[in-house]
Regions:
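Signature of uroporphyrinogen-III synthase
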Residues: 1-225
Length: 225
């Protein structure tokens, strides 16, 4: 059986474990990063809050910030929008391709139309959503910290890296076998792989498990042994 590593914990994978079992893949699932809240204060006015992930939203709302009633919410993609809706937050802007930060940023800049946005983030944020905005149209606030927890991972045939920070943490204690197939959760992770001269087979347009399963099937990784 082929082994597949994904830098997410099993609790976050829904039925992906069953999918791997049905397709004769031995799953190794482990996030190599942890997160902790950071105290923050909101010091300026804003018209919109943009969440690049549900994690940013969770840490933001955990501190119960005072938000004016007319403030709109925006997010990077459908999965984040779905999770925001579960906590009662309606997204007025939803990125059409969460795995393509450049497109999300361009579309968001057009939608924003001169309004001011607040961007909650981690210490390792690349601020991709803001790249097409003038600094006068946004404020940033760190709401959580990302920490590496390196761990030795058995050699696998397939590696799925869900973020640049998980990739960085993985490489502290591991090397990628020569003929391994690499899948990146979006362009930010691909750029990190490119910078290390690591070839990437697939970049997910949308960073979802549904898209991952679809790409695994499409690329014939799941050939029966």
């Amino acid at each position: 059986m082929k082994r597949i590593f994904i830098s997410k914990n099993e609790d976050d994978l829904g039925d992906f474990g069953q999918f791997c079992e049905e397709n004769k893949l031995t799953l190794i699932a482990k996030s190599l990063i942890t997160f902790e809240a950071v105290d923050f204060k909101l010091t300026s006015e804003f018209d919109c809050v943009f969440f690049s992930s549900i994690r940013a939203a969770t840490f933001f709302f955990e501190k119960k910030p005072v938000i004016p009633k007319n403030v709109l919410f925006a997010c990077s993609g459908k999965e984040t929008a779905r999770k925001l809706s579960e906590i009662g937050i309606t997204s007025s802007f939803i990125g059409s391709e969460s795995g393509n930060p450049e497109k999300v940023s361009l579309d968001f800049a057009k939608w924003l139309e001169g309004r001011k946005v607040l961007f909650p983030h981690s210490n390792l944020s690349k601020f991709s959503a803001l790249q097409n905005l003038s600094p006068s149209y946004y404020d940033t606030v760190q709401v959580y910290q990302t920490n590496s927890i390196p761990s030795a991972i058995p050699n696998c045939e397939v590696y799925v890296f869900t973020s640049p920070s998980n990739l960085f943490s993985f490489l502290i204690k591991n090397k990628i076998p020569k003929n391994a197939l690499i899948i990146a959760y979006g362009q930010s992770t691909k750029k990190q792989l490119d910078s290390l001269n690591i070839a990437c087979l697939v970049v997910l347009k949308n960073a979802t498990l549904y898209d991952l399963k679809k790409e695994l099937s499409r690329c014939f990784i799941l050939r029966k042994e």
